[in-house]
Regions:
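NAD(P)-binding Rossmann-fold cofactor-contacting core
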Residues: 122-150
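Glycine-rich Rossmann-fold phosphate-binding loop(s) that bind the pyrophosphate
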Residues: 109-110
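N-terminal Rossmann-fold NAD(P) dinucleotide-binding loop
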Residues: 113-114
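Conserved beta-strand elements of the Class I
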Residues: 104-105, 269
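Rossmann-like adenosine-cofactor binding region
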Residues: 152-241
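Adenosine-phosphate binding glycine-rich loop
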Residues: 201-304
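N-terminal ligand-binding/catalytic initiation module
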Residues: 1-82, 90, 100, 249, ...
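Short helix-loop-beta connector
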Residues: 96-103, 125, 187-188
Length: 304
């Protein structure tokens, strides 16, 4: 993320092809010289897969040699996307959430919801988790699984409002076209992470954005036109509630100390993620290094 904010990374806005069913296939190339490399990710987003045996996000990552351009590896990008997205949110919580944050709200019931709960446990002393989603049965199932695997009190609730009530951390990971995070749901001092993407709507309402200290991965990425940007920030700008300068900082600027983070215990902070390819490059480099060390994978001769 420091590469992104310093300009060392080469990372054009993603492009996508859409299909009539509402799905899309996006291309996300990047070069990240520090702890990354040269790669591109191809990722499909098909919200209609929710509740089926297929994930909503499916991806491949292709790694290239940054000196010669030679293809080096083809990796499962679905797992990489899940883990790097949750890791980015956890990094934002490490930098912005109150140190005493103990109650976590999970909005959504998919793979990102579970990954976010697991990631937040690594950076804050979470003691209680509340889960809400469109499907009550799936919320109950996720809460039960989190309680078993994480060893904390995890309960399903009926509404997003109930999940957010008195929460110190709110993680939104949905495909909702209408806000699941509303300002009136939130208590002072909460840290919100939002990774949901919907071309027809948004996950966080304008009032929350206007009141919050807003941090992103890349200002250029969030303000880019679809499919690269996000309605969560574009719409409040169009409504005249905020200016583009309301975006306080990029994560990389917090890491280097170029910008400060939370300034008071009661401040609401918001990390709006659109997912940037530099994160995929860094994650792919870690996976490829580990695979080589452990002798994993299959070698394919493309010239044969």
């Amino acid at each position: 993320m420091e590469d992104v904010s310093s300009g060392r990374a080469s990372m054009p806005a993603r492009i996508a092809a859409t299909v009539p069913s509402g799905g899309l296939l996006a291309a996300m190339p990047a070069y990240a010289p520090t702890g990354g490399g040269l790669m591109t990710k191809l990722v499909s987003l098909f919200p209609g897969n929710s509740g089926t045996s297929l994930p909503t996000h499916q991806a491949l990552v292709i790694v290239f040699d940054a000196e010669s351009g030679e293809p080096l590896a083809l990796l499962d990008g679905t797992s990489i996307t899940t883990l790097r997205t949750a890791a980015g949110s956890a990094l934002s919580a490490e930098l912005l959430a109150r140190p005493d944050a103990r109650t976590l709200a999970i909005l959504g019931t998919g793979v990102q919801a579970r990954a976010h709960a697991e990631a937040m446990m690594r950076v804050r002393p979470i003691q209680q988790i509340r889960v809400a989603g469109r499907n009550r049965d799936r919320a109950v199932s996720l809460a039960s699984a989190l309680q078993d695997t994480l060893g904390v009190d995890a309960q399903a609730v009926d509404t997003y409002r109930q999940a957010c009530a008195d929460a110190d951390l709110v993680c939104a990971a949905t495909h909702s076209p209408v806000p699941v995070v509303e300002r009136e749901f939130l208590k002072p001092g909460v840290h919100v992470t939002s990774v949901g993407y919907n071309t027809d709507g948004r996950e966080v309402d304008s009032a929350t954005v206007a009141d919050a200290l807003v941090v992103v991965e890349s200002v250029a990425a969030v303000l880019a036109p679809p499919p690269a940007g996000c309605n969560d920030l574009r719409l409040p700008i169009e409504e005249g509630l905020i200016e583009p300068g309301h975006i306080h900082a990029e994560i990389g600027e917090l890491l280097t100390g170029a910008k400060a983070g939370r300034t008071s215990p009661d401040q609401i902070t918001l990390y709006k993620s659109v997912g940037v390819a530099a994160q995929d490059a860094a994650a792919a480099d870690l996976v490829l290094t580990a695979a080589r060390r452990q002798g994993l994978g299959v070698t394919i001769d493309l010239s044969a």
